[in-house]
């Protein structure tokens, strides 16, 4: 299905454009093994991928939340370049969309410093007209605030935009802001889980966007 009304595409970063899953899992396990020895295994931390760190750690130990976030971020920074890669067809798709005149943005719950690390490592930063991070908003996804901020910066109406992501936070943020939405089938939580939130599209690979927009 082609939708030529679209003029802007917003992307989540982690798990959507770049594969940070192993980095996130390792960062959680490193932190939780210190504060909650023996209580968390790999499968236990998968639900933590997507929500803001504060939301996750405050639910585990409110008193130690800030300490846990600091430990997580220190480990995450240390191991970042070792464990992060871009997903297949991402670079080529962004390049094609940019050449075709689409406005592109990132809407993420990460802090700007780690966002910049990922963009630099994968070389995709130059494709984006705006990047909205956790530093920029009071209410992260699934609240519509970060999506609305990105659209405001781009001068784009929600009806002309697609929000792309691997997590229900992304789909719901787009819906709450009035955009179309696209889930990604490579989400670590499984495409079926994401489909339950009824995104308008489900991408099997990022280059599917070229067909949705009519670029190819």
From Swiss-Prot:
It comes from the Bacteria. One of its GO terms (cellular component) is cytosol. It is an enzyme of class 3 (hydrolase). GO terms for biological process: DNA repair. Belongs to the HAD-like hydrolase superfamily. PpaX family. Hydrolyzes pyrophosphate formed during P-Ser-HPr dephosphorylation by HPrK/P. Might play a role in controlling the intracellular pyrophosphate pool. This is Pyrophosphatase PpaX. It comes from Bacillus velezensis (strain DSM 23117 / BGSC 10A6 / LMG 26770 / FZB42) (Bacillus amyloliquefaciens subsp. plantarum). The lineage of its organism: Bacteria, Bacillati, Bacillota, Bacilli, Bacillales.
């Amino acid at each position: 299905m082609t939708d030529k009304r679209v003029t802007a595409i917003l992307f989540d970063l982690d798990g959507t454009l770049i594969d940070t899953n192993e980095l996130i899992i390792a960062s959680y396990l490193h932190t939780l093994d210190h504060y909650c020895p023996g209580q968390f295994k790999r499968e236990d931390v998968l639900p933590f991928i997507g929500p803001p760190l504060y939301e996750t750690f405050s639910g585990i130990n409110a008193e130690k939340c800030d300490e846990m976030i600091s430990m997580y971020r220190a480990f995450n920074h240390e191991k970042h370049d070792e464990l992060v890669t871009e997903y297949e067809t991402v670079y080529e798709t962004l390049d094609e969309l940019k050449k075709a005149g689409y406005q592109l943005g990132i809407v993420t719950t990460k802090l700007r410093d780690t966002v910049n690390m990922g963009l630099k490592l994968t070389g995709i930063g130059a494709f984006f007209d705006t990047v909205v991070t956790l530093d920029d908003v009071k209410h992260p996804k699934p609240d519509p605030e970060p999506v609305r901020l990105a659209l405001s910066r781009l001068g784009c109406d929600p009806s002309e935009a697609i929000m792309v992501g691997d997590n229900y936070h992304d789909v719901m943020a787009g819906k709450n802001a009035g955009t179309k939405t696209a889930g990604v089938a490579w989400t670590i939580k499984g495409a079926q889980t994401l489909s339950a939130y009824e995104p308008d599209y489900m991408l099997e690979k990022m280059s599917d966007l070229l067909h949705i927009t009519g670029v190819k």
